Amino acid sequence: MKKIALTALAVFSLAASAAYADVVKVGVIGPFSGPFALQGKNFKAGIDAYMAEHGNKVGDDTVEVVYRDVPQADPAQSKALAQELVVKEGVQYLAGFYFTPDAMAVTPILKQGNVPMVVMNAATSSIVTKSPYVVRTSFTTWQTSTPIARVALDKGVKKVISVVSDYGPGVDAENAFKAAFTDAGGEVVEAIRMPLATNDFSPIMQRIKDSGAQGVFAFLPSGPTTLGFMKAYVDNGLKSSGIQLFAPGDLTQESDLPALGENALGVLTTFHYAVSHDSPENRKFVEEARKAIGNPAELSFPSVGAYDGMHVIYKMIEATGGKKDAAKAVEAVKGMEWVSPRGPVSIDPESRHITQNIYLREVAKADDGTYYNKEIQTFEKQGDPGLKAQ
């Protein structure tokens, strides 16, 4: 059955170029319903913002986006939807992928289907190693977790306990922080891995208090789990007792800040993007993306990965003249440089991963009473240290 499915992809890839010469379809897989629907909504806002700014045509070709919903991480469903998009819908590009397992599951069909994949969020370093047709426009957990170790040490914190969700990006975050922290003389006194479904964090908070650590490094996927963790951090007295919290920016994404409120004030994170980033490119992007998403408070980081993902896809379409040629499409964007809403970025010609600035941010309160991530330091031109650790 697997051989038949792959053969169908190969046969269809030959016919698709002729059948869809003037329409180039982009298949986007992400969570558009369920507990992570806001992340899918941000994918769509970023895509809509890009197309509002640049139109829906590349040369003589019209770009059409086809969406498929995977509410929670489901590798089997993601692979089935990707096959359906390539075989039945005739998409020439696959994109999106909020969850790492979903992106991993789709990589085996890329070569046979002659289709590139543009990862707009999924953050495990090794995704780009699974196929030469994968390009990433988001970030990796290694990329955003490494600088925060330096920040903790600069704050005088020498002993830290690590707490992460037990899945690919969580393990990456744990390893990234530990490598950078211990190499610089710090000590990770304990490393806790929590099941993804964890919703009672009180026992974890007690272990943190009992560990004797001066600080806690935390990584959880953005959404309901981060809200629960932050509430427990405050309610169990860790914040008031001076145990400092350090994390990559998933923990304080903008769409969660209204719910986190005072609990998040002063929390330090390192990340590739903040909605508050001060640049002409970002102000223009935020204006369009907020129109697209409807509720301005819901705009968050997946939107910029999607926006830049479409920028890369448009370049691929231009380079191939709208024809279906995954190898040529990917080759065209290796080494590509541009100024993104997040700052200067480029696609590494070897890894096909995005090189970008990582920003130290502190949750602050604006004059109008809203909360935002205030950028206070820049780590320039950060690649992905996780690829060297593979």
Curated annotation (Swiss-Prot):
A Pfam match: Peripla_BP_6
Any one GO BP annotation for this protein: amino acid transport
Keywords, alphabetical: Amino-acid transport, Signal, Transport
InterPro entries listed in its UniProt record: BCAA_transport, Leu-bd, Leu_Ile_Val-bd, Peripla_BP_I
The keyword NAD appears for this protein: no
SUPFAM superfamilies to which the protein is assigned, alphabetical: Periplasmic binding protein-like I
Signal peptide as annotated in the record: 1-21
CDD domains with a match to the protein in the record: PBP1_RPA0985_benzoate-like
Record-annotated membrane-spanning stretches: none
Source organism superkingdom: Bacteria
UniProt record similarity statement: Belongs to the leucine-binding protein family.
UniProt function note: Component of an amino-acid transport system.
Name recorded for this polypeptide: Leu/Ile/Val-binding protein homolog 6
Organism: Brucella melitensis biotype 1 (strain ATCC 23456 / CCUG 17765 / NCTC 10094 / 16M)
